[in-house]
Amino acid sequence: MNIQALINDKVSQALEAAGAPAGSPAAVRQSAKPQFGDYQANGVMGVAKQLGTNPREFAQKVLDVLDLDGIASKTEIAGPGFINIFLSEEFLAKQAEAALADPRLGVASEEAQTIVADYSAPNVAKEMHVGHLRSTIIGDAVVRTLEFLGHKVIRANHIGDWGTQFGMLIANLERVQQESGEVSMELADLEGFYRESKKLYDEDEEFAVKARGYVVKLQSGDEFCAEMWKKLVDVTMIQNQRNYDRLNVSLSRDDVMGESMYNDMLPKIVADLKAQGLAVEDDGAQVVFLEEFKNKDGEPMGVIVQKRDGGFLYTTTDIACAKYRYEELGADRVLYFIDSRQHQHLMQAWTIVRKAGYVPESVSLEHHAFGMMLGKDGKPFKTRAGGTVRLADLLDEAEVRAAQLIESKNPELAEDEKKAIANTVAMAAVKYADLSKHRTTDYVFDWDNMLAFEGNTAPYMQYAYTRVASVFAKAGVSMDDLQGEIKITDEKEKALIAKLMQFEEAVQSVAREGQPHIMCSYLFELAGQFSSFYEACPILVAEDEAVKQSRLKLAALTAKTIKQGLSLLGIDTLERM
């Protein structure tokens, strides 16, 4: 149950009954400190100002008609007109019982929407590098959360599989194939192959002429070029899939919807934009001038949709892409996990999409932008030699460092178990370090911090889970075989349940805002509440069996919530570390 939403509805009804205009915001939030209750209604002052009345007097009117029977044990007016709400112990215990009995932990399914999520999007014939990490794991965490809430999510891996560079790549692939027979699907060094192709193109005029010819042939559907192009895509995606599998990212080959998918739509779109009077000829190119964006001279900015030579641009593809996602995929929402530097480009494409009537305003187009991954020097994360860090190399190093960590913590474990634990911790550490930061900010990549057992890190959260799970091993009972009712006998129990009952609020916030750090913060706070409870409230040596069973139930609900929350982030838990 979303208790915040429940109370918000109740306060909204009371506001209206007290004379507020219909639809006035109740602005119910989780209280910052326990002395202000569990929730606080902050909307009274704004309404009182609107009505020209004293805020505290109006707050009292609201309280007089506020029905929180069976939910709150106390309400009070604080400061200039805040309403503090204290949840009743009986209500909390009842909600905790219901959550523990529910495989979904009390989280309701939402009314299903069709949501397209555009994330990862690496380029063909290039290896994935650290720059692809944020889009891939942030997008995947949000997708998992949306699916958990019951939405139909279509993953769209918008790979860069088209463009003039394919002429030189096909020409080089042909050369390699002629020299060494069949090209291996391993093609180990994609980056090397790309650099070699570029060098040949720049230095060998005969090769360059052939490459330019292959661009034209590929675009006109030549069978040989199409076959070579497909081989390049296959080789690249086989390598990318290894990274996805290692990272426990839910993308597969079936989710690939590359730039090439929209090729046939582009001439029709430009023709339609011309017919609507949106695209006009300017110096031989087709340009859409947008009043919403100004150039440095304060004039409407021109967005080119077709070059003078007849070629199309990324903007044209993005217009086609949005149109396809609405018309063919039936999207209610489209989420783009693309770095913040692309914001203006996307906004311009979407402005054209709306003006042309391709996607109605009722369909939400959302840019879930993210900042950069920086090194300790505050500059973009690079190798020591100043090169781009390959994603596979980063994951390899994470596994080596995690193995050293596990060896130092638990050397007596069997080798295969140590390796399995190290792999799980390594991938979790890389992902959680990113997911726990607000996605719009740049963040500093720091091995020592991400593998620490203190603070808001993956090892800390995974250890928090194993610590709770160990209670049941010591008790010799299963989490699913507990008797009696949850009874609150201590303030720390009440505080733990109140935090547990905020799980649905965290889940819904991640889904609504595309911000996985909300879940990380919630889980970290929950682990802290459990520690306080564990120290203050003995479980296995509780004063009587009823209290012991009740506290075991709270431990079970905590373990299940941490496990489910981490699962939504694409992170596995461990039974022991």
Curated annotation (Swiss-Prot):
InterPro entries registered for this protein in UniProt: aa-tRNA-synth_I_CS, Arg-tRNA-ligase, Arg-tRNA-synth_N, Arg-tRNA-synth_N_sf, ArgRS_core, DALR_anticod-bd, Rossmann-like_a/b/a_fold, tRNAsynth_Ia_anticodon-bd
The subcellular localization recorded is:
Cytoplasm
Question: Its GO biological process terms?
Answer: arginyl-tRNA aminoacylation
Tell me the SUPFAM superfamilies matching this sequence: Anticodon-binding domain of a subclass of class I aminoacyl-tRNA synthetases, Arginyl-tRNA synthetase (ArgRS), N-terminal 'additional' domain, Nucleotidylyl transferase
Q: Which CDD domains match?
A: Anticodon_Ia_Arg, ArgRS_core
Residue ranges annotated as motif 'HIGH' region: 122-132
Which Gene Ontology CC terms are recorded? cytoplasm
Q: Which family does it belong to?
A: Belongs to the class-I aminoacyl-tRNA synthetase family.
What PANTHER family has UniProt attached to this entry? Answer: ARGININE--TRNA LIGASE, CYTOPLASMIC (PTHR11956:SF5), ARGINYL-TRNA SYNTHETASE (PTHR11956)
Description of how the protein assembles with itself and partners:
Monomer.
Q: Which NCBIfam families does the entry mention?
A: argS
Q: What is this protein called?
A: Arginine--tRNA ligase
